Amino acid sequence: MKTNPLPATPSVWGGSTVELPPTTRDTAGQGLLRRVLRPPISRRDGPVLPRGSGPRRAASTLWLLGLDGTDAPPGALTPNDDTEQALDKILRGTMRGGAALIGSPRHHLTRQVILTDLCQPNADRAGTLLLALRHPADLPHLAHQRAPPGRQTERLGEAWGQLMEATALGSGRAESGCTRAGLVSFNFLVAACAASYDARDAADAVRAHVTANYRGTRVGARLDRFSECLRAMVHTHVFPHEVMRFFGGLVSWVTQDELASVTAVCAGPQEAAHTGHPGRPRSAVILPACAFVDLDAELGLGGPGAAFLYLVLTYRQRRDQELCCVYVIKSQLPPRGLEPALERLFGRLRITNTIHGTEDMTPPAPNRNPDFPLAGLAANPQTPRCSAGQVTNPQFADRLYRWQPDLRGRPTARTCTYAAFAELGMMPEDSPRCLHRTERFGAVTVPVVILEGVVWCPGEWRACA
């Protein structure tokens, strides 16, 4: 009788499973196959651990958050480390991290010692904008370089000389070597340009504040002569934005006689710096209402969200009617999209400068190469020619026709410049707070705008033409 060998796989007999042991031959074959397929350097008994270390364990949630003790290894849980203790540790760590973040925001301070001719911090308040002014001795040289032919370049030097004669020390010329006023208060600049604003009553209030609260008997003369300096700068194309820059938001100051040491926030949150005044330890940005423009409200743009702040200077270049005006504009538009909005807002100035910006300039000589003679050169076979690849070779390029037009009296980008803007910073809140109110400066009431939560991040000037 022939019998079949027992199977090496599990069999089902009577509803139960019976696993038969493998034979010695099968075991020997599996060992040989395992030695062939697995290299000698492979791990045989789990992961290879360094000497003296235990097996790998899962990291706990507290250890991953950095809230567990430094001496407790990851995954080491105690019976008392229940859910309530875990939540308590997480909340305490979050509060410590939040307090450290809120208590020490990053901001940068700058300090300068100045004369109090164009900036008197005692009369202004913390949060006032300060602008740095280039050395006045450089301006006459810039006028000779940039003024169009026919313009009176000496007008700028004379205007600054008359302004320096009305300063506190009586002279501020470069040859005297005395201290000069290197900072200009935004309020003083607005007061000097008071005649240029549409809100004339609010601008006159700023001028009355500067005249009444700035120390000295010749404050009105300084305002008039500084205004003449601004008009002379526009006349000679040494535009004010080329000699002024943002210095910072005023925080604290120390004055003695006609000198002042001012401290300002030049970058970062304005309200992060302590003013040292017990009544007002923090300062918000304060601006004259006549010099503040909410561009989104004017043009019907935007909605809730963060906004940018820009410092804008506008110019009118008509003969004997030169004007300069300064604004702080709030808008959600980024710098690359602001110029079209300014063109719409100050379109009248742009048209005026384009039409009348060349007045008082020496006109070109009549019939002196007015147009490039392209048709005549193309029709004459004797005219020297060269290929595009030979233009850079002087042997061929020197024989070509030279067109030398007379550009005197012709419109340029500088004659059409009507504005310039620079980014000051931003208001990162979803709903930036701009408070319109009246503040009392001594005996004068001035309409102002208070901006809260301003973060300074100044940028470069961009001219609009």
Curated annotation (Swiss-Prot):
One of the record's GO cellular component terms: host cell nucleus
UniProt record similarity statement: Belongs to the herpesviridae TRX1 protein family.
Domain of life: Viruses
Listed GO biological process terms: viral capsid assembly
Pfam families recorded: Herpes_VP19C
GO molecular function, one term: DNA binding
Function: Structural component of the T=16 icosahedral capsid. The capsid is composed of pentamers and hexamers of major capsid protein/MCP, which are linked together by heterotrimers called triplexes. These triplexes are formed by a single molecule of triplex protein 1/TRX1 and two copies of triplex protein 2/TRX2. Additionally, TRX1 is required for efficient transport of TRX2 to the nucleus, which is the site of capsid assembly.
Keyword terms: Capsid protein, Host nucleus, Virion
Keyword Magnesium: no
Lineage per the UniProt record: Viruses, Duplodnaviria, Heunggongvirae, Peploviricota, Herviviricetes
Protein name: Triplex capsid protein 1
Quaternary structure annotation from Swiss-Prot or TrEMBL: Interacts with TRX2, MCP and capsid vertex component 2/CVC2.
Compartment annotation: Virion; Host nucleus
Family annotation (InterPro entries): Herpes_1 (IPR004999)
